[in-house]
UniProtKB/Swiss-Prot annotation:
It comes from Hahella chejuensis (strain KCTC 2396). Coiled coil: none annotated. One of its GO terms (cellular component) is cytosol. InterPro entries: AlgH-like. NCBIfam families: PRK00228.1-1. This is UPF0301 protein HCH_00550. Belongs to the UPF0301 (AlgH) family. It comes from the Bacteria.
């Protein structure tokens, strides 16, 4: 992370319209960590064709009837599960990213969700988005991404199709007016 750029932890990373990478085209990611070694985030608007009840059944945890979608969190370690949630709770492997947003990777949170006693707000993802040292900063300087402050309501309550527009609207940007052509002044 360059000294000219502060951490992007607890920020949204929104793909510019000209970013045609199939892993990120049209996405909004929540940045969970960002430091000198790189960045890690979860794509929050790409539901998979799988429901949480299906995943819980595959893990033999029960949870029948939970219609919540499971998301494609990114192209790295797509077999690994991540749960963004609020409030923090007492799970084996949780990190508080912001006062109202945590990430957990341990199975105990899924067990609690299957029993109906999990966190109030959740987003379950398989895989994550990762960037090496300096990679994300370079992509931002090349106009592939827009960053803006994260909002838990967008993660947990906003329909997937509205997340990008809602996040940009919070900082006064009209997504529909963004150009699909990039450049530098």
């Amino acid at each position: 992370m360059s000294s000219s750029m502060s951490t992007l932890r607890n920020q949204f990373l929104i793909a510019m319209p000209h970013l045609k990478d199939p892993n990120f085209e049209g996405t909004i990611s929540y940045i969970c960590d960002h430091n000198d070694e790189g960045a890690m985030g979860i794509v929050i608007n790409r539901p998979l064709d799988i429901r949480l009840s299906d995943m819980l059944a595959q893990l033999e945890l029960g949870g029948e009837g939970i219609a919540m979608p499971v998301y494609s969190g990114g192209p790295v370690q797509i077999e690994r599960g991540f749960v963004l949630h609020s409030p923090l709770g007492d799970w084996q492997s949780s990190i508080e990213i912001a006062p109202d947003i945590c990430i957990t990777t341990s199975k105990d949170i899924l067990e609690a969700m299957a029993r109906g006693v999990g966190p109030d707000r959740t987003l379950v993802a398989l895989g994550y988005a990762g960037w090496g040292a300096g990679q994300l900063e370079k992509e931002i300087s090349n106009n592939f991404w827009i960053t803006c402050p994260a909002d838990s309501a967008i993660i947990f309550r906003t329909p997937d199709s509205e997340k990008v527009v809602s996040a940009l609207g919070r900082v006064g940007i009209d997504y529909h007016r963004l150009s699909s052509i990039s450049g530098h002044a």
